[in-house]
Structure formats: C-alpha cells, structure tokens
C-alpha cells in the first residue's frame, strides 16, 4: 500500500492507496514541530477507528513547507521501513516536463496537480487550486508544466481585511444572495466572493488568449466547491487531484525502476 502525504501551508493531508483505490483520507493542521511518533500515533488511531489494516510499503511526500519534510521522512523510515519519494527532489522523477525559467523553483503541489490534471483531462489545461494561495497552473498539449499565476488566497484576503481595518470583523466566506450587501459581513463576503469570481474569470481568459488555443479549466482545493457554484467558471471539479497526482508520480517512478 502507498501512503501519500500532501503538506500545505495550512493543512497536511494523508491518503492511503491500495493500487488505484483510495481507501483512507485524513487531514490535520500543518505543524513543523510535530514528531514522527506523533504522526504515527495520530494516523494509526484513525486507521484503527475505521477498521483499516494497512500494510504500508511505500510513501510519497509533497510539501510546500520544507521544515515538515524531515519528520515525515523519519515517519517513513521508522514505522514503514521505506525511504519516501519527495516531489521536487532529484531522486523523484516526474512523468511530465517542466518548462520554466532556468533556476526557477516550482511548488511541488503545482507539479503534482499538473501530473494529475494531464492524466485525466489531457493537455491545454488550466488547473485552479484554491489553497492558502490561489494558483493557476498551465498544462501544455504534451503535458508539460509551462508556468502559471499565483494570487492571494480567499481566506488570506478576508484575514487581511480583518487585521488591517479595525472596524471590519472576521467573517467566513460564502456565496452571498445579492451582490449589494446590506450589512458589513454581507458586504465583505460579496466583495471577496465576486471579486474572486472576476479574478478567476479574467486570469483564465487572459491565459487562453495568450496561449491561443481552447483550454479546459478545472478546479481543486478546499474552497473550490464554493466557486464551482458559479457554473461558467470551470469545466470540472476534482476534490482529490493532488492525491491522484502523487499516486501517478509514485507509479511512474516504479515503472522506471526508481525506488528512491
């Protein structure tokens, strides 16, 4: 079985794969101080509660937080007796090319989404990921990652309003019934929601115009379902795109005889 780990700035997600079937999926907050022992106790407890008897033989990690990787490596070595693949490291091969400026470092989550998006939808694709940042990743016809856009995340924008303006409260994002708000919370929700709808539409339109070819647009990430309600923005929504990509990258490395 394969344990896939996606460590983001806010949350870390673990998924257990048996072949091409995901049989478990768990989320925790990202904390670099968390030890390998703590990860194992937490994970094994949740597996036991769900009656999952895991025989983990492989592990793959994607992390946008470098400080977390060390203890995840220890988890893999100590408890599963396997050396993990880490996306972005030289020992982890990708099944797609990366065509960006020399010396540029691309976030591993963006590469993983590219792999998964291309496998399912083919090329000429835009992947919009609503995470701590809102990212737009462009996949060429042959599956290559050719760049993208990074914008502030939705919740980050709401928090910035709250912290920078003393009179504005903390609010949760939701789709407002009307554009014109009749109270402060509704005004903030409208500004952020419809502002991001406009941001996504404009950036995707400009990417398509610059690319000069028809492109599919798919969404993923924690807040993607909220914006999926705006039907004309996306062609599809994928709730576990990153985990699908990690499974595919692991499979690719096995196929070429690369066992980290």
From Swiss-Prot:
InterPro entries xrefs: ATPase_NBD, Type_III_PanK
Top EC class for this record: transferase
Pathway in which the depicted protein is active: Cofactor biosynthesis; coenzyme A biosynthesis; CoA from (R)-pantothenate: step 1/5
GO cellular component, one term: cytoplasm
Cofactor comment text: A monovalent cation. Ammonium or potassium.
Catalytic activity line of the entry: (R)-pantothenate + ATP = (R)-4'-phosphopantothenate + ADP + H(+)
CDD domains: ASKHA_NBD_PanK-III
Keywords from the UniProt entry: ATP-binding, Coenzyme A biosynthesis, Cytoplasm, Kinase, Metal-binding, Nucleotide-binding, Potassium, Transferase
Active site: 109
Family to which the UniProt record says this protein belongs: Belongs to the type III pantothenate kinase family.
Presence of the UniProt keyword Nucleotide-binding in the record: yes
Residues that, per the record, bind substrate: 107-110, 184
Pfam families xrefs: Pan_kinase
GO BP, sorted A to Z: coenzyme A biosynthetic process
Chain sites annotated for binding K(+): 129
A GO term, aspect molecular function: metal ion binding
Name of the protein in question: Type III pantothenate kinase
Assembly and binders: Homodimer.
Binding site residues for ATP: 6-13, 132
Cofactor or coenzyme needed: NH4(+); K(+)
